[in-house]
UniProtKB/Swiss-Prot annotation:
It comes from the Bacteria. It comes from Clostridium tetani (strain Massachusetts / E88). The gene is gltX. Its EC number is 6.1.1.17. ATP binds at K256. HAMAP family: Glu_tRNA_synth_type1 (MF_00022). InterPro entries: aa-tRNA-synth_I_cd-bd, aa-tRNA-synth_I_codon-bd_sub2, aa-tRNA-synth_I_CS, aa_tRNA-synth_I_cd-bd_sf, Glu-tRNA-ligase_bac/mito, Glu/Gln-tRNA-synth, Glu/Gln-tRNA-synth_Ib_cat-dom, GluQ/Sye. This is Glutamate--tRNA ligase. GO terms for cellular component: cytosol. Its main location: cytoplasm. A motif ('KMSKS' region) lies at residues 253-257.
């Protein structure tokens, strides 16, 4: 390892889907490394064996591969500082925990669950934050050996002082100082022999040469304890980059426990991976310009972690949808058509020109999953209310809509060469003859051929795709519906 090289890591737990916050952490860590031609590592933190979910590891690998966040070292490709799975490094943590015990920076704790529960209840009844009372830190060497020999279950705890202060520097939040009296003697090694996240991440970050640690701001409160571990070992502290939380709104955090969208959920809703990644990059960071559309390569060039905000970032679904539309419009018609085809299945079964439908949708689509509801009227005219014919801006009502359709019907019947251009020319000639505004005729025709308030494209384009026979049939249905409505 090059001592001057920036090394970052993404260290997820295989506990389910890839949450938006986790993906942002991976992206920022990747960008920080690649901006300086550094190394980006993948490490799997599976010390909490009970929370592991089958298939979660595949989700991690697939998400990183799909988004182009490629790691230089990791469990699947190896590297000089492996293993890269924490459960395979158990012996390392035990060794380093023993070093802390020898230094007086950690101790064995034999307290039962009942005693710990009682301590917690006492703290709650007094309205104080729960903190272990150092009961086992006073055990003699003989008592400890006796308990170990008897096979009494134990954990290993960090031995934090009660007096003085500890501070740490964060690249985003600056210098943060805490009273040592507030620091709990956190568990380093659990009773099952596995390390806690809090201990393993410090040991691994040092042994793997991590120079910049990217994580959520919820870990700010644990950082003084991490610093005390670094100091106890005599290790250099990496640069801390704590990112602001991603909020659902001004009151609540985006959370997978509350069922908020994961990366997989967003893909299933029809969002594009590049749009998602671009949007996530802007949740807490901005380039200092009004520019908003960035490829991954653009981000590598522009990303500066010093521009990450302290303030929480709001996950704005409308903004993501807008950005997704921008990405869709960057596709060629052929590329968009390929993406749209699966969404036509089951909705369009008749022999329509699907490429022409894609042409209408291309610049009007923001979300791929909305395609079915935009095109379902092609196969079958939906049941619709005559109220659709009434449009304030177009100045249409039942009576003038009926008149327009009755005048348009013979004009449409007379067209031999059925295409958008001829339909357009014929109807525009009619409008000229009638000396009315375009909307007076076009709105009723569009309503009659689609049965919908919103359509991809106007009356002419829809009529061409439907074909002459189906268009005439639908206009006649519209005439009958309006007559019945007026004569009621």
């Amino acid at each position: 390892m090059n001592g001057n090289k920036i090394r970052t890591r993404f260290a997820p737990s295989p506990t389910g889907y890839m949450h938006v916050g986790n993906l942002r952490t991976a992206l920022y860590a990747y960008l920080i490394a690649k901006h300086e031609n550094g190394d980006f590592l993948l490490r799997i933190e599976d010390t909490d064996q009970e929370r592991q979910v089958e298939g979660a590891l595949d989700i991690i690998y697939n998400t990183l591969k799909m988004t182009g966040i490629h790691h230089d070292e990791g469990p699947d490709i190896g590297g000089p500082v492996g293993p890269y799975v924490q459960s395979e490094r158990k012996h390392i943590y035990t060794e380093y925990a023993q070093k802390l015990i020898d230094k007086g920076e950690a101790y064995y704790c034999f307290c039962t669950k009942e005693r710990l529960d009682m301590l917690r209840e006492n703290s709650e009844s007094l309205g104080r934050p729960h903190k272990y009372d150092k009961h086992c830190s006073h055990l003699s060497k003989e008592e400890i050996e006796e308990n170990l020999k008897a096979g009494i279950p134990f954990v290993i705890r960090q031995n934090n002082p009660n007096k003085g202060t500890t501070y740490f520097e964060d690249e985003i939040f600056g210098k943060i100082t805490v009273d040592n009296s507030e620091l709990d003697d956190m568990v380093l090694i659990k009773s099952d022999g596995f390390p806690t996240y809090n201990f393993a991440n410090v040991v691994d970050d040092h042994l793997m040469g991590i120079t910049h640690v990217v994580r959520g701001s919820e870990y700010l409160s644990s950082s003084p304890k991490y610093n005390r571990l670094y100091d106890a070992f005599g290790w250099d502290v990496p640069k801390y980059i704590h990112c602001p939380p991603i909020m659902k709104d001004s009151h609540s955090k985006l959370s997978k426990r509350n069922g908020d969208a994961s990366f997989q959920d967003l893909l299933e809703k029809g969002y594009l991976k590049d749009a998602i990644l671009n949007y996530i990059a802007l949740l807490g960071w901005n380039p200092g310009t009004t520019e908003e559309i960035f490829s991954l390569e653009d981000l590598i060039g522009k990303f500066d972690y010093k521009s990450i905000n302290k303030a929480p970032a709001i996950f704005d679904n409308k903004k993501l949808k807008w950005m997704n539309g921008e990405y869709i419009r960057m596709f060629s018609l052929e590329e968009f058509h390929k993406l749209a085809l699966p969404y036509y299945k089951g909705v369009i079964t008749k022999d329509f020109d699907l490429l022409k439908i894609s042409e209408l949708l291309h610049t009007r689509t923001e979300l791929l999953s909305e395609i079915p509801e935009q095109v379902d009227f092609f196969d079958e005219l939906p049941e619709y209310s005559c109220d659709l014919y009434v449009h304030k801006k177009m100045k249409t009502n039942f009576e003038n809509s009926l008149e327009s359709l009755e005048k348009a019907l013979p004009v449409l019947e007379s067209i031999d060469n059925w295409n958008t251009e001829t339909i357009h020319d014929s109807i525009m000639e009619l409008i000229k003859e009638l000396e009315v505004k375009n909307g007076i005729v076009l709105w009723p025709i569009r309503t009659a051929v689609s049965g919908k308030k919103f359509t991809p494209g106007g009356a002419f384009e829809i009529a061409e795709i439907l074909g002459k026979e189906e268009t005439l049939k639908r206009v006649k249905i519209g005439i009958e519906k309006l007559k019945n409505e007026i004569n009621q």
